[in-house]
Amino acid sequence: MVQEAQGSKAPVQRIVDKVTGIFVPVVLGLSVLTFFIWMFFGGVDMLSHAMLSAVSVLVIACPCALGLATPTALMVGIGKAADHHILIKDAVALEQMRKVNVVVLDKTGTLTEGHPTVTGWLWAQPQEEHYKDVLLAAELKSEHPLAAAIVTALQEQEHIEPAALDSFESITGKGIKVSYQGTEYWAGSHKLLKDYHAALTDVLGEMLAQYESDSCSIIYFGRKNELLAIVAIKDQIKATSVEAVRELRTQGIDVYMLTGDGERTASSVAVRLGNIQYISDAMPDDKEEFVRQLQLQGKTVAMVGDGINDSQALACADVSIAMGKGTDIAMDVAMVTLMTSDLLLLPKAFNLSRQTVRLIHQNLFWAFIYNLIGIPIAAGLLYPINGLLLNPMLASAAMAFSSVSVVLNSLRLRY
């Protein structure tokens, strides 16, 4: 993947290729023009001067420096990113990243550790033996990380075995529903709770608020229109998340958090991250719509997620960034993949993009300046002033030096 990315072309490289395609015939024309000017105005040694100057123009002109300016910088930039566990899919992604002014972060698995654990159970109804068996069987079929936390907690308890379910259905962005012995059970977010019109008692509401203020995600478990239990699950915020958000802000990038959690939980997490802006109760469609709204405002948006309930938003973002532990969908869609859970790689990736593009511009600038100055000197512009006529051997040395200088300038990025 790294080799493919290093061999890809950035948009600026396509422009340079067109310029180089024009540059070569122009240089040939200038060489011929130089020859005839010397033949007409060269005086006694006009033939030797004409030959030397025409050859020097051909030799000193260096499309190589122009051609090397972009790919050498890209190869070094993408290689350095890989050294830091940042995989960049192609040169377009590397160049696009420098334009990003808004980063949208999914919460679970991106800002948090991705290792949720159950911290509490609140039973709204007297427990029956099969309730936990049904919940275990249902969550075993779910791919959501919160489901894994419930499965782990239930499996640690004695005498709980997965029930034989009649059916299973995943409800995108809300949860799951199953059938057991002809009765429908469900587990998911408070949106699913509302869909089933299940009541929440005042006592449960107060206890629930305490869990939410502690940044816990809440899973509701019910039967038909009856709430059976509430499961509080906590996923610790990564140690690097706060610092990563701070660095992104330092780079002038606005940061948003999207989460399917309720308002209180989302607010609690946002405060801990430094009072970042957030959207709570976000369904997959809501996340995609939010990214599109930012784009309509003229923003260049990077979406960072693990592919669970955010693959649509990843697909429509200007720059899609997947966490290394994300889903296969996220990996396929993502233009950039952070191979570790360290969120500090995110500001580092944006900074590396800006450094690489800045280096490309430097290389192109000096390549153009070299040709702009070198070709007239090779043609004999200084001869009437100080008698200097450039030897073709010196012209070839200057040409080689220009190419080497571009490569050396690109290699600076590694250190």
Name every feature range the model reports, one short phrase each:
Residues 146, 155-268, 283:
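Signature of the cytosolic headpiece of P-type E1-E2 ATPases
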Residues 15, 29, 42-61, 69, ...:
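Membrane-water interface of transmembrane alpha-helices in multipass transporters/channels
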Residues 52, 62-138, 294, 313, ...:
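Conserved catalytic phosphorylation-site environment of P-type ATPases
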Residues 4, 8, 88, 180-182, ...:
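Conserved ATP-binding TGD loop and adjacent catalytic N/P-domain core of P-type ATPases
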Residues 30, 334, 339-415:
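Membrane-embedded transport module
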Residues 1-54, 237-238, 352-359:
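Actuator/coupling domain of P-type ATPases
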